[in-house]
Amino acid sequence: MRTIALSIALLGSTAAMAANDIVMHRDPGCGCCEKWAAQVRQKFGRAVKIVDDANRAVIHKRLGMPASLASCHTAIIDGIAFEGHVPIADMKRVLAAKPKGVRGLAVAGMPLGSPGMEAPGYPADH
């Protein structure tokens, strides 16, 4: 089943980041985040700066993201926030379209088959 990426309204300003920077804040105890970052690096052809962040609730609050959409990492790409294992194709669509009012996408939890959460018997959701 295809994971649905949910639009989230973010209150914090991420526009100050350079267009080429990809910054991923992650739970330092999580192992899947680095796999997700590796896929992002490969598919975007850009470096990913990984920031270990044990108190992720602070960034979620700053971005105005509801706790119900929280996952193990938050990436900021071209001023748009991506929470959790958002499929890379969906990220590229949002970054290309930059729809008015959409400041980010989220996939809550850690769904099997999503980037970084591949598992035998579950289709890859890219």
Q: Language-model segments: which ranges?
A:
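Positively charged n-region of N-terminal signal peptides that target proteins for export
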Residues: M1-I4
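N-terminal signal peptide c-region/cleavage motif recognized by signal peptidases
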Residues: S13-A16
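Local sequence-structure signature of Cys/Sec-based thiol-disulfide redox active-site neighborhoods
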Residues: A18-K43
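Short active-site oxyanion
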Residues: D21-I22, R46-A47, D78-A81
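Soluble non-cytosolic domains of exported or imported proteins
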Residues: D27-E34, I50-A54, F82-H85
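Extracytoplasmic/secreted envelope proteins and their assembly/folding machinery
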Residues: C33-A37, R56, H60, I88, ...
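Conserved helix-turn-beta segment immediately C-terminal to the redox Cys motif
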Residues: A37-A57
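Thiol/selenol-based redox catalytic cores and closely related redox-interacting motifs
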Residues: K61-H126
